[in-house]
Amino acid sequence: MKLNELFAGLPKRRRLKVLGRGLGCGKGKTSGRGHKGQKARSGCAVNGFEGGQQPIFTRLPKRGFRSMSRARYEIVNIGALQRLISEKKIVDASNISKELMAELGMIPSPMSKVKILGKGALKAKVGISYDAVSKAAWEESLLTEGLSDS
């Protein structure tokens, strides 16, 4: 194999036509966009426009409602806590605060609401500050009572 044979079998890519460089070049003046009109302007794509046909978002029925007052919890699994304890990232397992969880990247902010879920298992008793706990996490884990912030 020689350097001049490297691209021998590959199809050649057609050179793109340069736009807007005079009437003689074939794509001058309006640069293949036609005359005036919405599609001749820059940034022409109209989101959701389907050529006059009823757009999909108006054809489909409206569904659902999202409550502004609904509590949204950040989820922390007890298995993830045990992994951090095993890796010695959590030294004092008797007092795992929201500040520590935020520092370790488990939750975005110490102000976040935290719900403990039962995926995984704990090996020792742990004290965690939380707002809610699942039934499975409460039954299977060794969570201590009284540290909830709510």
Curated annotation (Swiss-Prot):
InterPro entries: Ribosomal_uL15, Ribosomal_uL15/eL18, Ribosomal_uL15/eL18_sf, Ribosomal_uL15_bac-type. Transmembrane segments: none annotated. One of its GO terms (molecular function) is rRNA binding. Keywords: Ribonucleoprotein, Ribosomal protein, RNA-binding, rRNA-binding. Disulfide bonds: none annotated. GO terms for cellular component: large ribosomal subunit. Pfam families: Ribosomal_L27A (PF00828). The keyword rRNA-binding applies. One of its GO terms (biological process) is translation. Part of the 50S ribosomal subunit. Binds to the 23S rRNA. Belongs to the universal ribosomal protein uL15 family. HAMAP family: Ribosomal_uL15 (MF_01341). This is Large ribosomal subunit protein uL15. It comes from Anaplasma marginale (strain Florida). The gene is rplO.
